[in-house]
Amino acid sequence: MDNNVDTITLTDEEGKETEFEVITKLDIEDKEYVVVVPKNEEVDEAIALRIDNNDNGEEMLVPVEEDEEFNMVAEAYELLFSEE
């Protein structure tokens, strides 16, 4: 995924599209993640997504659902923004 992407549009299971603002991209243990928040919505929580490749080699975003993986991304995110 390009580091200069500011927004992405994701489609849920029901076909509803939502635009998200990309807060940051993180490289952790040979995996790439993006942290996003819904654009134009009052939300306090960010969403962590892992960048994977599908069978065709195209990038796809996968929600981080495992607690251990989520905690690792959250820790890296907090460390990054505590340094600013």
UniProtKB/Swiss-Prot annotation:
Coiled coil segments of this chain: none
One Pfam family per UniProt: DUF1292
Entry similarity comment: Belongs to the UPF0473 family.
Family matches, as HAMAP family: UPF0473 (MF_01448)
Protein name: UPF0473 protein CLJ_B2791
Organism for this UniProt entry: Clostridium botulinum (strain 657 / Type Ba4)
